């Protein structure tokens, strides 16, 4: 709907059609729950793995049923009205797709853009396993391949293992057989958008996988729990040192966060003797036995199975999982030593003020017949209409095509030397629910002139002064850091010395 041009535009009035329309786009909102003083609008987009828009995704705010829900339309975009001033978790669900969550710091009386989300279907390769088997059973997922190389998740279910799914009401239901799938999130360029939840800031984007059981997904179970740890494997496609720890975490959708789990280990298959794999778990390129294997819980039955699955020379990550859900195997990461934030380096050198300039800015002049608004750069005039109580008013900011009030110069770098490791400079401007993004090559004394057309995200002209938020970012290629041996659970813990550059595709946080 069009906006009233005679008054300044406020977000509460501009967006009430979303949840008060007939019918409303956002349905199930408790009457009166949206407060004009704290209102905010979350905007986002949902896509399929191939980048096409995904319609019909149910979008809610986790643990806030009073805000109702909305469905993504044909273009995959959505708007959701909430009360801001806090952290909120956006929950995405669609039948046949793995669910996703994203946490946002939502302001008052403003729009906030959620990162794009990619929702994927479960792996088509399924293994049906009976839990009363007397031998170790194996599931191997579909082999995936991208610029980092091929890999496939493998799970080895020990004999005598029992399992039960934990339902949303807290009850458990035993399972006698399992239709197991392993679905990797971290494949291809849009891997970060596919993640089940936001990674912690210090955790590198490396490898994440959903271990699932069909019956549990159909029942909406929180997880599937096992009576003993399940060894999981994936090729060492990034090249971490043999013998090093593999930080692991699982995603708890009830808490909407990653939970640190026990570290795994990078191992190497050296060969096989008598049908049993010779395995190096310490990094000395020698077959380990006894205590070294006992410390990580590797049994003879597991080594017999490894001998049938992997050739000599294969390096693997091995992680024990006690339950099925989304798991993340990731090292800590960060930028190189010379890196800095945009607010810490490369900022403009302060310039001295002219001697005749006062600290206070010019005041607006609003005398009758002569209106000069210096701060907003507006010229105005008013003329009495004879015989009426009204006046004819003119304001230069209302003239079609005027851009002076819609422009601002944004300084991206100063005169000081920039870091050698700086890859690019990023600029974001948010105004009227719209997000404008630009990327620049590193350069000194860089200034960009931003021009706004005065319209909001729905294509309507806004009236009155509107808040704009500007963010400047310095982007670097991150590098992995080795974990400390003293950490039993290294997930989301800062590391020590650098190992090498991290995977492309971005990081968490």
Positions of predicted regions on the chain:
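Surface-exposed beta-strand/loop patches in extracellular or lumenal glycoproteins
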Residues: 223-241
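A short, solvent-exposed loop/turn motif at the edges and junctions
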Residues: 9, 62-64, 83-112, 118-120
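Structural motif
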Residues: 32-55, 237, 413-418
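Short, acidic Ser/Thr/Gly-rich low-complexity loop/linker segments typical of extracellular
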Residues: 53-57, 61-83
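Structural beta-strand segments of beta-rich domains
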Residues: 38-42, 153, 228-230, 404-410
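Long, compositionally biased, intrinsically disordered segments
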Residues: 1-17, 27-31, 103-150, 167-220, ...
